[in-house]
Amino acid sequence: MFDDIWRQFRKQRLGLIGGGILCMLLLVALLAPVLAPYDPLAQDLYKRLQPPSIDHWFGTDDFGRDILSRIVYGSRISLRIGLIAISLALTGGTLFGLVAGYRGGMVDMLIMRLMDLMLAFPSILLAIAIVAVIGPGIENAILAVSIVLVPQFARLVRSSVLTVREATYVEAARALGATESRLLFYSILPNCTAPLIVQTTLGMGTAILDAAGLSFLGMGAQPPVPEWGAMLSGGRELLLRAPWVMTFPGLAIFTVVLGLNLFGDGLRDALDPKTT
């Protein structure tokens, strides 16, 4: 099975490019202390707002901090935010979807109407509202982003459960006395694995983008943390004088989100039964 999936995935050139971008992000995050030429928090007011040069490839910001070093260390923060947020969303959405699809009736209606209500708002607006209630900070931003991504997973899992809950093998397991939890997690959930993998990859891009948006608005990571969205926020008043302060963090966000989307699309096509 995995050989078939890998064979199909290798045909997805854009998916391979996306995978390469993700591998590069992972390596940069892991090797940040080695790759970063300077301390990301070190200030040198004598070198403030220097354009890209041999000494500072991406230039310096208004505190004289090396932008390349801050972007390199920022990859760790963005990766952590994306992984934690998508893991929480995956767990919560899967549980809601399993219960809604298996129980049906009033339980299904209540859960799905709640999901529909959340989906009625753009994810970033809902995340802003949540952070406005619980307060700013990276941890609260992660929680807010994970909450707004729950409906995507819940609807996906519910639709898969509705497809297989009356399948012969599920009925056989039920007849043999399998408990409800065993039916859900051992008989039904494995059939949701492929679409969940794809949604997790695509959702992680949304998580990183929304978290960067919160930091840009001052509701996520707080200075002097080298988070890409916070770096964008710090450079918005310098756009005309020192455009590199915003340009390189913006390119970092764009590249990572693009890589996740390309990789997710490649996985989706590789896992499509019509191609495998």
Residue ranges and their predicted role:
Residues L31-L35, V99-R103, A129, V133-I134, ...:
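Helix-loop junctions at the membrane-solvent interface of multi-pass transporters
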Residues M1-T94, L98-V99, G105-M106, L110, ...:
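Gly/Trp-centered helix-boundary motif
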Residues T60-R65, Y102-R103, L162, A172-R182, ...:
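Short helix-to-coil transition segments within interhelical loops
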Residues W57, T91-G92, G101-Y102, V107-T163, ...:
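Generic hydrophobic transmembrane alpha-helix motif, especially the helices
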Residues K11, S69-I81, A85, D116-L119, ...:
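Alpha-helical transmembrane segments of multi-pass membrane proteins
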Residues R76, M118, P122, V131-G135, ...:
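Residue-level hotspots within pore-lining transmembrane alpha-helices
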Residues I130-V133, V145, S160-V161, D210-A252:
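Glycine-rich helix-loop "coupling/hinge" segments at transmembrane-helix boundaries
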Residues I77-I81, F96, D108-M112, E139-L143, ...:
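Short alpha-helical transmembrane interface motifs in multi-pass membrane proteins
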